């Protein structure tokens, strides 16, 4: 692998601008070589002056890059030292409390079943668990910084070697010895010491001396391109998707036959539509995950997933394919129910019952950790006023807004099975009299309207909670106003529908109010999508017209197509309200998957915007703490900032003299004297063809 590709694959995306600009240096060298005057037509002195001038510019650029790398490394190292001191304080406090407790006298006792513990023991158990997670995230940040150190040194060595080869000189090697090999980012070995001390602390204080268990907890996922999925996972993805395609073709022919013999199949459509939307959502989320990884958007950090164990796009395709097969088989069974001994109403119940069981299955099988994460996130979403709202919380609530049809169809299914289904018949899901008006299709008692408002309500109260936490009216209250327009839209749609059925004279008034709030809501959400969620139409966009200054995805056409798509689908309701009710139901069924697709496109650019925010803050790992930063920690941080090897003022002298000793006056743990050195090796080849 060429080093440029290796560098691109192994950098930390949030620190991309802080790495050596290897490609820019290569272009600089090749451009100088191409533009150099020929010895055949120019005297030798002119050629020498040309290359001397170029080398002066080249080494000045190298100095700027080296200063940038030194400064960034010093900042991140000071941050790591502060973080390690804080974690040591938190761990020492937990150990002190544990020693004072008569109920818990050793760390081993915290492993007994949680439901046998007292309240104090539960809190202590949770603190130790949080500390383990915090140390594992901190260890990951250290490995990333060590990786940054090694990649940049290798980059300088490679580019200076290439310089010497192209210009047929040794000044590049001399410059490396004089400047790079004495630079703080390379000579400072404090990062190795922190890695060793972290391993020792986790081994001796949190894992009772079991180094193998400690290193398993601290294991760092491969730094670089996505690792290939297990062969069996890929096999299952191909198998499930192939079967799903075949069953879909069969389903189309069966549906045509069913429509020819029985044209009143609307209940089947309503009952099975939600399942299809869920499967479509999972499949498109798999494509989202693949696209984010390919573009370098760190969705694992954004969603605060466990970097050591999370679902890849192959796993999402596998789940979507498996559920898709069950959905097809269940619907086919309904079509052929008249020749079956099993009543038709059993099949939908079996399908959705299995889906619910798959999600809440308490056994540690079928992606247990991911399912538990989703259930916990759903709980946080539905109890939003009582929790601090994170990105994953409002992202999931946003997805529910595009999946509101699933909630409405669930309400319809419950109503249908409760009031319209003839349980003593097995011919079909429809009432005996097709001409009988459907009770569950109406806005009876406002239940459908309330269900339709639930997703918007969840986002609304999340915005209020974020305002309570931050006291920032913009954007949180303004965003809450956006979701409040949904309440008016749904309310007037319900009033229009009920008054129209009863032939009231004020029906037209509610219709115009409905259309008015639809326009307000669509314009509001469209502007918010493009400007706030996606960060587009930035006045400093430069050459990225109507976009933003920095874009992640390679083609600008992606952004322009997404803008057009968002405008069209945000105003697609115009088609739905301009036609008859019967055809309107069909159009609504067509638009529901399109709304899921719109959300799929939205996901790409919303996470890109969040990723760029993380890049601006150089945030590459989760910051997990048991306790907030106290006064002592703040004082230590300020002292560290004032030290020579702490975070230095960028405007002051950037001398390469570096004092590697920093005194951290913290309670020493027993494990600190047993630290062992660990190093991450960076692939390095001296073959010039690979540079």
Curated annotation (Swiss-Prot):
UniProt superkingdom: Eukaryota
Gene Ontology BP term (one): phosphate ion transmembrane transport
GO CC annotations on file: Golgi apparatus; plasma membrane
Important for inositol polyphosphate binding: annotated segments: 158-165
UniProt modified residues of type Phosphoserine: 663
Entry keywords, A to Z: Cell membrane, Membrane, Phosphoprotein, Transmembrane, Transmembrane helix
Catalytic reaction(s) noted: phosphate(in) = phosphate(out)
Chain positions of site Gating residue for phosphate transport: 573
Pfam family, one: SPX
Record-annotated EXS domain positions: 439-638
GO terms assigned for molecular function: efflux transmembrane transporter activity; inositol hexakisphosphate binding; phosphate transmembrane transporter activity
Domain SPX: from-to ranges: 2-224
Subcellular location: Cell membrane
InterPro entries assigned: EXS_C (IPR004342), SPX_dom (IPR004331)
Phosphothreonine PTM sites in chain numbering: 685
Residue ranges annotated as Cytoplasmic topological domain: 1-228, 297-309, 384-388, 472, 535-553, 622-691
Membrane topology: Multi-pass membrane protein
PANTHER family: SOLUTE CARRIER FAMILY 53 MEMBER 1, XENOTROPIC AND POLYTROPIC RETROVIRUS RECEPTOR 1-RELATED
This protein's domain notes: The SPX domain plays a role in the regulation of phosphate flux. Inositol hexakisphosphate (Ins6P) is bound between two SPX domains of the homodimer. The SPX domain has high affinity for inositol polyphosphates and its affinity for inorganic phosphate is two to three orders of magnitude lower.
Biological role stated in the UniProt entry: Inorganic ion transporter that mediates phosphate ion export across plasma membrane. Plays a major role in phosphate homeostasis, preventing intracellular phosphate accumulation and possible calcium phosphate precipitation, ultimately preserving calcium signaling. Binds inositol hexakisphosphate (Ins6P) and similar inositol polyphosphates, such as 5-diphospho-inositol pentakisphosphate (5-InsP7), which are important intracellular signaling molecules involved in regulation of phosphate flux.
Family assignment from sequence similarity: Belongs to the SYG1 (TC 2.A.94) family.
Protein name (database record): Solute carrier family 53 member 1
Organism encoding this protein: Mus musculus castaneus
């Amino acid at each position: 692998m060429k080093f440029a590709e290796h560098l691109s694959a192994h950098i930390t995306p949030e620190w991309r601008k802080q790495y050596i600009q290897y490609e820019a240096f290569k272009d600089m060298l090749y451009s100088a070589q191409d533009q150099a005057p020929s010895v055949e037509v120019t005297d030798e002195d002119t050629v020498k002056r040309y290359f001397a001038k170029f080398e002066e510019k080249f080494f000045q650029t190298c100095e700027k890059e080296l200063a940038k790398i030194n400064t960034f490394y010093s900042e991140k190292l000071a941050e790591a030292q502060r973080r390690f001191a804080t974690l040591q304080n938190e761990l020492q406090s937990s150990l002190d409390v544990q020693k004072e407790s008569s109920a818990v006298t050793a760390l081993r006792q915290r492993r007994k079943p949680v439901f046998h513990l007292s309240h104090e023991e539960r809190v202590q158990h949770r603190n130790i668990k949080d500390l383990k997670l915090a140390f594992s995230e901190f260890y990951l940040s250290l490995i990333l910084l060590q990786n940054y150190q090694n990649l940049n040194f290798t980059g300088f060595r490679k580019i200076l070697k290439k310089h010497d080869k192209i210009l047929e000189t040794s000044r590049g090697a001399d410059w490396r010895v004089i400047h790079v090999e004495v630079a703080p980012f390379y000579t400072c070995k404090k990062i190795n010491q922190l890695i060793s001390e972290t391993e020792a602390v986790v081994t001796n204080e949190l894992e009772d001396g079991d180094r193998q268990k400690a290193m398993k907890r601290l294991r760092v996922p491969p730094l670089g391109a996505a690792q290939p999925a297990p062969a069996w996972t890929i096999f299952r993805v191909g198998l499930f998707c192939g079967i799903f395609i075949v069953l879909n073709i069969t389903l189309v022919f069966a549906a045509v036959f069913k429509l020819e013999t029985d044209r009143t199949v609307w209940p089947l459509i309503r009952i099975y539509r939600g399942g299809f939307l869920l499967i479509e959502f999972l499949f498109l989320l798999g494509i989202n995950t693949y696209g984010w990884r390919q573009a370098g958007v760190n969705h694992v950090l954004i969603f605060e997933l466990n970097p050591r164990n999370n679902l890849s796009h192959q796993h999402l395709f596998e789940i979507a394919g498996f559920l898709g097969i069950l959905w097809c088989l269940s619907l086919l069974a309904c079509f052929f129910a008249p020749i079956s001994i099993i009543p038709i109403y059993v099949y939908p119940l079996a399908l959705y019952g299995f889906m619910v069981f798959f999600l809440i299955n308490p056994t540690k099988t079928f992606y247990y950790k991911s399912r538990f994460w989703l259930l916990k996130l759903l709980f946080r979403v539905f109890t939003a006023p009582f929790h601090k709202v994170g990105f994953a919380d409002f992202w999931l609530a946003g997805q529910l807004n595009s999946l509101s049809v699933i909630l409405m169809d669930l309400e319809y299914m419950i109503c249908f099975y409760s009031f319209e289904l003839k349980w003593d018949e097995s011919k079909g899901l429809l009432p005996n009299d097709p001409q009988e008006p459907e009770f569950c299709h109406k806005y009876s008692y406002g239940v459908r309207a309330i269900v339709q408002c639930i997703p918007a309500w969840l986002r609304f109260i999340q915005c209020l909670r974020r305002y309570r936490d931050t006291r920032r009216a913009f954007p949180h209250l303004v965003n809450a106003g956006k979701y409040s327009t949904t309440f008016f839209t749904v309310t007037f749609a319900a009033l229009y529908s009920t008054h129209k059925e009863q032939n009231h004279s004020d029906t037209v008034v509610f219709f115009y109010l409905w259309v008015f709030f639809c326009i307000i809501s669509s314009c509001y959400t469209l502007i918010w999508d493009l400007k706030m969620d996606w960060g587009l139409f930035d006045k400093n966009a430069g050459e990225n017209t109507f976009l933003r200054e920095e874009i992640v995805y390679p083609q600008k056409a992606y952004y322009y197509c997404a803008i057009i798509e968002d405008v069209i689908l945000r105003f697609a309701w115009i088609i739905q309200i301009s036609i008859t009710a019967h055809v309107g139901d069909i159009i609504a069924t067509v638009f529901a998957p399109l709304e899921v697709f719109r959300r799929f496109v939205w996901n790409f650019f919303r996470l890109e915007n969040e990723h760029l925010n993380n890049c601006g803050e150089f945030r590459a790992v989760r910051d997990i703490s048991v306790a907030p930063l106290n006064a002592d920690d703040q004082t230590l941080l300020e002292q560290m900032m004032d030290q020579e090897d702490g975070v230095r003022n960028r405007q002051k002298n950037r001398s390469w003299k570096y004092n590697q000793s920093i005194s951290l006056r913290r309670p020493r743990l027993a494990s600190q004297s047993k630290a062992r050195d660990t190093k991450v090796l960076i692939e390095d080849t001296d073959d010039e063809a690979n540079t």
